Amino acid sequence: VEVEDAQYCAVVASGLLACTIPFLAFASAHSHVLVADTVYGPTRRFCDRTLKRLGVEIDYFDPLAGAGVDKLIRPNTHLIFLESPGSMTFEISDAPAIAAAARAKNVVTVLDNTWSGGVFHKPLALGIDVSVQANTKYASGGADVINGSILTNREDLISRMKETITDLGINVAPDDAYLVLRGLRSIETRMARHQSSGLEVARWLKQRPEVQRVLHPALEDDPGH
């Protein structure tokens, strides 16, 4: 099953590791990274606790900035990290515009693609350099493994990230890799049902007087639709 249409993939021991490895591979003391304001909470905590302590400069940006992210890029910006849909608030970022702005200044882009399971959203096809996801969520399918994946079509980037993985000694156990491969056999069927069921619940909630707002990008009146 092809879920991300990527040429290269590295598997790590958790989804959070998949998110943090690109930072460790491409950022260093005195370098600058841009992080979307709505990324996964533990990813943001890693930036605030660990990266800042290592001397990395971090700015959080509006996930709806689109091409406007160009104005935030500095000469020492090495990485732009975003999540789309945004974690918990589900904004849809203009990934192609962000990728184009970054590419023009030789900045690596990384997108946390966990919410789509790699099925509904193809970041690499939109120009993003690296797509990461927590296989723990959807790819495994059995709630019996903690795992993450890092995907790209660039050999230079995967080589750098694999070096970081090796240096930190965080290679994944073979049994865990097997469990994810098992789950991928049914991911398209499962994600289709997740999507239809979730949308049905979202539409029901919109009719409820107790609910002020429903955050779901598949709703026709959602800004990210």
Walk through the language-model features, giving the residues of each.
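Conserved PLP-enzyme active-site core in the AAT-like
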Residues: 8-207, 215, 220-221
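Contiguous C-terminal substrate-recognition/catalytic subdomains in enzyme active sites
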Residues: 223-225
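Portal/gating segments that form or line small-molecule/metal binding sites
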Residues: 5
